[in-house]
Structure formats: C-alpha cells, structure tokens
C-alpha cells in the first residue's frame, strides 16, 4: 500500500461553529419534522451453502499467506481477499458461474420478497428499488468497445434477478436497470415511469441510483443486497424511499 495524507480533525471546532452560524442557519432532518413515511426494517438472514463454507476457508488460508509474506502482493493481497469475500457473501456464482444456483441464498430470498411485495402492491402499482454495487451489468459498455462481440455474456446478479422475476410472471417492461439509462434524458424518462408505476422494480448501484434520484412517489420497499464501503452510502440509499413526496405512510 501507499501512505496518503488525509484530513483527520478540526481544531477549535466550537469557535468555527460560531463563525459559521453568523452566515448560516442550520437545521437537521429531525428538527424540521418533514412529512416522511414510517420505515420498518427487516433483516433477512440466509445460511451459507457448502460451497460458500469451503470458499470462506480458502479466503482464510489466503489471508494467512498474505500476513506471513508467503505471497507476492501483486498476486494476492488483503484488498483482493476482501473483494472476493464481498462477492462470495452475495452469491457464489459471482466467483464461479458454474457453481449451482441453490435455494435459500441471499439473491433467491430477495427475489421471493420482491415477488410477494409486487403482488401485494398490484392495486396501487407500488414500486420497489433494489441496490447492488457488486456484479453490475457491463455487457453494453463492453459491446460498445468491441470487447464482447464473440464472447459469452457474463453472469451478473442483475440479469439473474430479472430472469427469475420474469419466469415468475412479472412483465419484462416492469423491470429496469439504471445502467441502461446512460443519458440524462433516458434517466428522466425512466424515473417518470417509476413514479407512474409503469416500471415497478428498478435495480441499480449506489453511485447511479443514489443521490439525486427522485422516484419516491410509489416506493413501498427498498432491498439492500449488499453493503457499501461507506456508511454515508447507506444513508443515500435510504434517502430514496424515506423522503418527502412518498404517497405511502409506511415503507420497508
């Protein structure tokens, strides 16, 4: 790794706040009492598969070799191990697409919940948002660069979820990836469809579907498939549904 200089802390913070308040009126969300929906949180725990258990052991063995200096840092390091661990925690097929799609996994549990909420919200055309920063769709970008013309389409969690939702009866036009809206005009059109209930499940990453996204009108549920690196990204995710302008009094 390389050492970096980073901001650490403020000095004389009380004095700084006094100066700042001479030109600014600061109110936090809890002081404003904005009309936002009540949020009910659910933690869905999935048991690891046998393949995942074995792979976790391999990650531990790799970490021991890295800490012991038995491997070249260019070949393996803790950043690579941590990245593989995040992928493995989401779905074993991200590591090896030939591994089986087993029932009860995190992705399959999420699909079940999406379908249940979709059916329950049919009358009001209620919508859902799925956040996933891992295994995002890259096929269109690759094709534009001429890299994926003759190769098999890579496995992604996004495609897997969409295929399963369609197989269970959800119309394809009601499912959208934020990655397909690659211009501001396309994003605006997509967001309008979500607010109108025409697109009822939208899947995206925190970077593309986080700050600045206003699709809250019919949002009834938000699914966090993975956990982002920065705590503030979770706040941005939550802010898409716990927001003024949501017609639902209670969301999940």
Predicted regions and their residues:
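Short, solvent-exposed loop/turn segments at secondary-structure junctions
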Residues: 25, 51-53, 61, 87-95, ...
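Conserved helicase ATPase core of P-loop NTP-dependent helicases/translocases
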Residues: 162, 166, 171-206
């Amino acid at each position: 790794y390389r050492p970096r200089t980073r901001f650490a802390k403020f000095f004389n913070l009380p004095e700084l706040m006094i100066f700042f308040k001479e030109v600014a009126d600061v109110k936090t969300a809890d002081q404003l009492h904005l009309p936002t929906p009540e949020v009910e949180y659910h933690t869905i725990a999935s048991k690891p598969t046998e393949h995942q258990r074995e792979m976790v052991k391999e990650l531990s063995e790799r970490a021991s070799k890295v800490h012991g200096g038995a491997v070249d840092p260019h070949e393996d390091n803790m950043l690579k191990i941590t990245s593989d661990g995040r992928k493995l925690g989401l779905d074993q097929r991200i590591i090896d697409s030939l591994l089986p799609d087993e029932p009860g996994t995190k992705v399959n549990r999420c699909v079940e919940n999406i379908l249940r909420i979709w059916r329950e919200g049919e009358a009001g055309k209620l919508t859902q948002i799925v956040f996933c920063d891992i295994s995002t769709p890259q096929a269109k970008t690759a094709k534009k660069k001429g890299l994926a013309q003759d190769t098999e389409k890579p496995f992604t969690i996004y495609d897997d979820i969409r295929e399963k939702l369609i197989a269970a009866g959800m119309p394809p036009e009601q499912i959208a990836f934020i990655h397909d809206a690659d211009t501001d005009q396309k994003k605006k059109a997509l967001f309008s469809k979500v607010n109108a209930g025409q697109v009822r499940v939208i899947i995206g990453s925190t970077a593309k579907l986080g700050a600045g996204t206003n699709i809250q009108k019919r949002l009834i549920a938000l699914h966090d498939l993975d956990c982002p690196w920065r705590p503030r990204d979770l706040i941005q995710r939550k802010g898409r549904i716990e927001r003024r302008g949501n017609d639902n009094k209670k969301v999940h």
